[in-house]
C-alpha cells in the first residue's frame, strides 16, 4: 500500500491511517 499522511488518497489501494488491511483505508 502507498499514500500515507497528507499524500493519502481515499481509494481502496491507499493507506489512510497506519497500516493497510485488505487494501482499504
UniProtKB/Swiss-Prot annotation:
What name does this protein carry? Omega-conotoxin CVIB
Q: Which GO terms describe its cellular component?
A: extracellular region; host cell presynaptic membrane
Annotated compartments: Secreted
User: In which organism is this protein found?
Assistant: Conus catus (Cat cone)
Q: What does this protein do?
A: Omega-conotoxins act at presynaptic membranes, they bind and block voltage-gated calcium channels (Cav). This toxin blocks N-, P- and Q-type calcium channels. It shows high activities on Cav2.1/CACNA1A (IC(50)=11 nM) and Cav2.2/CACNA1B (IC(50)=7.7 nM). In addition, it shows a higher potency when Cav2.2/CACNA1B is only expressed with the ancillary subunit CACNB3 (IC(50)=1.6 nM) than on Cav2.2/CACNA1B expressed with the ancillary subunits CACNA2D1 and CACNB3 (IC(50)=12 nM). Both the Cav2.2/CACNA1B block by this toxin and the recovery are voltage-independent.
Sites of the modification Cysteine amide? 25
Family listed: Belongs to the conotoxin O1 superfamily.
Q: Which SUPFAM superfamilies match?
A: omega toxin-like
Amino acid at each position: 500500500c502507498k499514500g500515507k499522511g497528507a499524500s493519502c488518497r481515499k481509494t481502496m489501494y491507499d493507506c489512510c491511517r497506519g497500516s493497510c488491511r485488505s487494501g482499504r483505508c
